[in-house]
Amino acid sequence: MRFKGLDLNLLVALDALITERNLSSAARKINLSQPAMSAAVARLRKHFRDELFGMRGRELVLSSRAEGLAAPVREALMHIELSIMARHPFDPARLNRRFRIVLSDFVTVVLFRNVVARVTREAPAVSFELAAPTDEHELLLRRGEVDFVIRPDFFMSSTHPRAALFEERLVCVGCCTNRELQPRLTFDRYMSMGHVAVKHGGAPRTPVEHSFLTDLGPTRRIDILVQSFSMIPPLIVGTNRIGTMPLGLVRHFQRTMPLRIVELPHPFPAFTEAVQWPSLHNSDPGSLWMRDILFQEATRMATTQELRVTSSPEDAEPPGHFVRSVSPLP
């Protein structure tokens, strides 16, 4: 089919090239041979009178013209897809789709592994591509290159819809044998102890720690920098080092490691983990279905945490472990 001289099938090829940034991957995505995809690139360049793509190794680098086409082309294809899908009842059991999601190791452990288990039962043909958070999530949403971003809500873009999932807070964690880690940790002791800290971007602190540490001024003694929260527990067990981590993640590691949880020496407000999706996916049945699962599993997680705290004494945490419930969202 042609529209004003353009074969509309080329838009499908263009969208795949923009999304995959690799000729072979884009060809596989839309079931074309590599020579056929190369021919499509030549036709696209001729139509738009622009190179559209350069090469950096095996990666395609978009020209400014291709950058400008990314969102409109994705949105146009999504509208066509939704119009076709609207004629048929949505059935997750028959859904064959890969969801691309940006989320942290923390969210993966405390929430998303349960989401994956449920989706495997309800929609066995659905798969996932998970990516670590970056500073470019708004651009990824605008291009439609990801289906969801799960991050603290204060990092969310104002140009796309979002919804709260659950609340969390940071705590101090150390090994149960760490005699320097007292139940009431003073600020001076906290700052002087050796820390295993997460490096986010170029800064030796996570974004959720930023206001806590910036407001208080002094710099922590950082012994080890790591790339994720999940790397902290193995590096503090059997040592006098401490870390600052989300409470839910520490509870997960407490099942297999001798960890002690202590309140931070200065009040730090809870933060809300939220989910955001591209505006053009707002009415997408698959996106709506996945959102419902995220909301339901987040509520289930919060309820389970409440039950743990209110359970009988024999089910309580071992002595020396501090536990406080994370309030579920209203």
Curated annotation (Swiss-Prot):
The keyword Transcription regulation applies. Residues 308-330 are annotated as: Disordered. It comes from Bradyrhizobium diazoefficiens (strain JCM 10833 / BCRC 13528 / IAM 13628 / NBRC 14792 / USDA 110). Residues 23-42 bind DNA. Keywords: Activator, DNA-binding, Nodulation, Repressor, Transcription, Transcription regulation. NodD regulates the expression of the nodABCFE genes which encode other nodulation proteins. NodD is also a negative regulator of its own expression. Binds flavonoids as inducers. Gene3D superfamilies: Periplasmic binding protein-like II (3.40.190.10), Winged helix-like DNA-binding domain superfamily/Winged helix DNA-binding domain (1.10.10.10). The lineage of its organism: Bacteria, Pseudomonadati, Pseudomonadota, Alphaproteobacteria, Hyphomicrobiales. This is Nodulation protein D 2. GO terms for biological process: regulation of DNA-templated transcription. GO terms for molecular function: DNA binding; DNA-binding transcription factor activity. It comes from the Bacteria. Belongs to the LysR transcriptional regulatory family. Residues 6-63 form the HTH lysR-type domain.
